[in-house]
């Protein structure tokens, strides 16, 4: 079978190769999935560069998300139930950028046939992260503000549409002026341009406080995918008992702030990783989440825009497009027909 692999961590364009390897065999509790499609997410690129939460054990195949059909089971009730079913594959170990992937049966979930392959392939990482962070963890109330960095990303756009649907307001931080009107057209309540090389964090802090609270006391809810100066400024904008979820490190720079910031406001900074969250919830919760996400994707609230589709043999072109800031939408690896 064909699989994209890397022998050592590094720049994706340089280290990724499409190779012919043996088809894996599922063990007890695992299933063999014939992959149909899988996206290129920022977390995949961080994994390839050696910057992800879980270090890569090279040689290895990347790919944490995708859709496929269960072709074989190593044994177990779930494996038997899912045979020949189309499933979402949330592969915490990576391995989806291949013709076939072996995963624990607990990491595949049947998906509705009403969703296209493209939407099914991008079903979990962004849509589930957007929903779980705002509705299950932070539980942002109607009328309250949520500050988010990386607002121009695919996930950031979902957050904006989700805010419009469920009633919370969004303060959106982007790096380029060209993104402002586009996000406003999606329903963003406020868009702020911040580039750490050009703008002062104090100005961003003041704008957040001024916009999100009448008294300038600070914002109650925030999510950060960037870290560095932007994420640090958001922390310093939190109000009394404010909460920020850190779910990404796109800048590869650490958060920097005085503990006094948290002490004086009793605010909190918490980490969020979807894979760990999903590992800790029950199958009924997962199935309920799938039904909810399916409706929201079908309604266009949590749908993913596909910018380009490539094959496994076009992996260099695919990762180049995925890292091109002018490309609006996801790059998808289409592996097989349903």
Predicted regions and their residues:
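NAD(P)H dinucleotide-binding glycine-rich loop of Rossmann-like/cofactor-binding domains
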Residues: 87-150
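Adenosine-nucleotide cofactor-binding segment
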Residues: 164-230, 284
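Glycine-rich NAD(P) Rossmann-fold beta1-alpha1 loop
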Residues: 127-128, 150-157, 228
